[in-house]
Amino acid sequence: MKISGGGRCNVTHACFDARELTRRYPRGERALIAPFKQFQAADTVAWFEQRGVKLKTEADGRMFPTTDSSQTIMDCLLNLANHAGVKLKTNCDVQSIVKAAGGGFELTLANGKQMPCDKLLLATGGCRTPALGQLAISLGHTLEAPVPSLFTFHVETPWLRELAGVSLEAVEASVPGAKLRERGALLLTHWGLSGPAILRLSAWGARELHDRNYQFALQINWLPDANPEKLAAAFQTCRRSQPAKFIVNTPLAKLPSRLWEQLVIASGIARETRWAALSGAGQHRLIQQLLRSEFPVTGKSLNKDEFVTCGGVRLNEINFKTMESKLCPGLFFAGEVLDIDGITGGFNFQAAWTTGWLAGRAMAES
C-alpha cells in the first residue's frame, strides 16, 4: 500500500456500475458480480469519506486521497484498528495452521508459540511464490499456479531504446496469434515498453505470455485512429504542400518528432529524402511501420508500483456471499490470495476492499 500509485495509493477507480467494474478483472470477473453488488467502488469512497479521508478522481478514473499520500490511507486503517482493540503482531510468521479438535484453529508461530482462534481470515496477499499459498493448501484448498501480472516488456530494438522517455497518449498494442489487444498510453523506456496499454496487455495475457516464456512478437499501431487510406491521402497532401521538405523533419499527426524520425528510417527511407521524392514502395513501408510496427519481446520486468500475481486459491472453493471456505468451515479469504487480479488503475485494491468487507461482516455475524 505504501508504494502503490507512486506512493500516493490508488485506492479505487471511478467505475460505479458493479457489472462494468467486473470487466476490469482478467481473473475473477464472474465471481465478483455478486460481491460488487454488496460493496463496490462507490461504497469504498463513502467508507473512507465517512472516516475523514476524501478521495479525488484523476482524468483516467484513478482515485487517490486528496493528500496524494499513501500514509493517509495507512493512518486511517491503523487508527481504526487500534480504536477497535485490534492487536497487531509483527515479525510473527505463521508456520502452520491445523483445525483444532474442539473447533476453530491452532496456529504455530515461527517462535514455536501456539495461537488459537475461533475463525481465521487468510489475507496473505498475492502468491508470488507457491510457498505463500501453502497455508491454504494445508487446509485443503487448491492453488492455481501463480504467475506475474502487470509487467512491462523488454525490447532489444536499439532505436526504440534510444527513445527512452518518449510517451504517447494513445496507441494500440497487440500480440499476433493471440486474442490480446489493448489501447492506451505508452511509455518508451531504456529497457523497452511500459505504460497503461502494456500493463493491461500483460494482465489479460498473464498466463499465455508466461507459457511463451515472455518471448513473443508485439505489434504497435502508433496511430490507432488512422488507416492506410487516410495516411496515403495525408502523404499526398504533404507531396503537394511541402514537396521540398525532408520527410524526417515533418512529423505526421502530432507524433513525437524523435519517434517519427526513427519510424521513417526504420521504413528504409533515407534521411535526405524529400516529400516530392517519396516512392510508392517507400510510402507503403512507412504506412506499415506506422500501423504495424513489430518488435521482439525478450522478457519482462515487474511494474514498480504494483506487485500483482495471476493465480491463487481456486475460486470455486469459496462462498462469495461470505468469503468463507466451502471446504473448511470457519476459514475465510480476502484479497490477492485468491485467484483474482485486475488491470492497473485501482482495481486490485477494490477487490481487496470488497472481499475484506464481506469476510469481516460474515465473521462478525456468524
Where are these regions (language model features)?
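An anion/pyrophosphate-binding glycine-rich loop and adjacent beta-alpha core
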Residues: 2-3, 12-18, 54, 142-147, ...
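Conserved N-terminal/central alpha/beta ligand/cofactor-binding core
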Residues: 2-87
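Flavin (FAD/FMN) cofactor-binding core of flavoprotein oxidoreductases
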Residues: 63-71, 150-158, 300-317
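A glycine-rich dinucleotide-binding beta-alpha-beta segment and adjacent secondary-structure elements
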Residues: 90, 262-341
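A conserved short coil-to-beta-strand element within the FAD-binding core of flavoproteins
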Residues: 90-104
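Short hydrophobic core segments
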Residues: 94, 114-128, 135-137, 186-191, ...
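Glycine-rich loop(s) and the adjacent beta-strand/alpha-helix scaffold that form part
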Residues: 119-161
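A conserved FAD-binding loop/helix module that cradles the flavin
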Residues: 123-139, 339-366
